[in-house]
Swiss-Prot record:
EC id: 7.-.-.-
Positions of modified residues (FMN phosphoryl threonine): 176
Protein name: Ion-translocating oxidoreductase complex subunit D
Quaternary state and interactors: The complex is composed of six subunits: RnfA, RnfB, RnfC, RnfD, RnfE and RnfG.
Organism (species): Halorhodospira halophila (strain DSM 244 / SL1) (Ectothiorhodospira halophila (strain DSM 244 / SL1))
Residue stretches spanning the membrane: 35-55, 88-108, 119-139, 209-229, 233-253, 261-281, 295-315, 316-336
Its job: Part of a membrane-bound complex that couples electron transfer with translocation of ions across the membrane.
Domain of life: Bacteria
One BP term from GO: transmembrane transport
Membrane-related topology note: Multi-pass membrane protein
Pfam family, one: NQR2_RnfD_RnfE
Subcellular location: Cell inner membrane
Cofactor(s) annotated in UniProt: FMN
Length: 357
């Protein structure tokens, strides 16, 4: 008679709330730097977005008949709102944060059934929808105005910027590095002549340049990503393959024609490349489950980013790239499957014959 034994199982070392809080902890330094760099309006936008996602998540949980306290306690909505706020223009009006927060929770999560059921990254769903619906507000980049500096708006002035839009935009806005490269290509100019004014590697590494609220500091984002890998919150394959693929593509084409194609440093340090590689594309719900699948997913993201930045109508492409590859995740998981316990990688059952003593 066969002996009944329990099936093999294991328990994850980190719970969902713990994982989400680790992500928030890793994103906090880059976010704090962005708030310092762009002043009170950036903090206003961050808080508005976070409050909106929490209220929207509570409403969705109540409508679905699920416990509100435990649903909010997993911090998944907070992470979605935080990542969304990091990717928004720092002086965007209050309603951008409200609409974006609602889209992230309702359209990005709620319609799919809630946490763990969504096909697309909620923050990027909101960001792309906002970019399509409100292109002016979503592409208005301000020059750095650090807190405490002579050019920084005071607290009361920041309320006017956030809630009434009373800012002299021509005096405070500037072009991002990717905007400058895109404009140069469109006007038939050489990228090599346009970049020195818009791109300085040292400043790009620190994040002292026009851009989204917390996408600029390459150094802090990379440190946060390394921390998440060390804590085993994210898999290393996605950021490693995504950054390597993008660097190889950029290097090859820049070598062929440096006047037409930006180099790897521009593609890696400018825009939201590092934010996407470490904090967005690594979302376990919307990325493949296998090591090979994650590598394919990351390479696809990198190729789309490079193609759209180089030939497309948008200078920044990470949100589009992540959403497109999110759509391919079920197909990747279908064709690239993990080995089933008790079977070979080809699917044949493992032999159960045992040699006698």
């Amino acid at each position: 008679m066969s002996e009944l034994v329990a099936g093999p199982h294991t328990r994850a070392p980190l719970s969902l709330p713990t994982l989400m809080r680790q992500v928030l902890l890793a994103a906090a330094p880059a976010t704090a730097f962005g708030v310092w760099l762009y002043g009170w309006p950036a903090l206003n936008l961050l808080l508005i977005t976070l409050v909106t996602v929490l209220v929207a998540e509570a409403a969705c949980l109540r409508a679905a008949g699920r416990p509100v306290r435990s649903g909010l306690g997993d911090s998944s909505a907070l992470v979605a709102g935080w990542i969304l706020a990091m990717s928004l223009p720092p002086w965007a009006p209050w309603w951008i944060g409200v609409i974006g927060g609602l889209l992230a929770v309702v359209l990005g999560k709620g319609v799919f059934g809630g946490t763990g059921q969504n096909l697309f990254n909620p923050a990027m769903v909101a960001r792309v929808a906002l970019l399509i619906a409100f292109p002016v507000e979503m592409t208005r980049w301000v020059e750095p105005a650090p807190l405490g500096s002579a050019v920084a708006p005071g607290f009361l002035e920041s309320l006017g910027i956030t809630f009434t839009g009373t800012a002299d935009w021509d005096a405070v806005t500037g072009a991002t590095t990717l905007d400058a490269t895109r404009t140069a290509v469109t006007e038939g100019q050489s990228i090599e002549t346009a970049l020195p004014e818009a791109y300085q590697p040292a400043l790009a590494l620190l994040g002292y340049a026009p851009g989204s609220l917390a996408e600029g500091s390459a150094l802090l984002l990379a440190l946060g990503g390394v921390y998440l890998i060390y804590r085993r919150v994210i898999a290393w394959e996605i950021p490693a393959v995504m950054l390597a693929t993008l660097a190889v593509l950029a290097t090859v084409f820049h070598t062929l024609d440096p006047t037409r194609y930006a180099d790897a440093g521009v593609h890696i340090l400018a825009g939201s490349t590092l934010l996407a590689a470490f904090f967005i594309a690594t979302d376990p719900t919307t990325s493949p489950t296998t090591t090979v699948g994650r590598a394919v997913f990351a390479a696809g993201c990198a190729v789309i980013v490079w193609v759209v930045r180089t030939y497309g109508g948008y200078p920044e492409a990470t949100a589009f790239a992540v959403l497109l590859m999110n759509a391919f995740t079920p197909l990747i998981d279908h064709w690239i499957r993990p080995r089933v316990y008790g079977r070979t990688r080809l699917g044949a059952p493992l032999s159960t014959d045992r040699e006698g003593p």
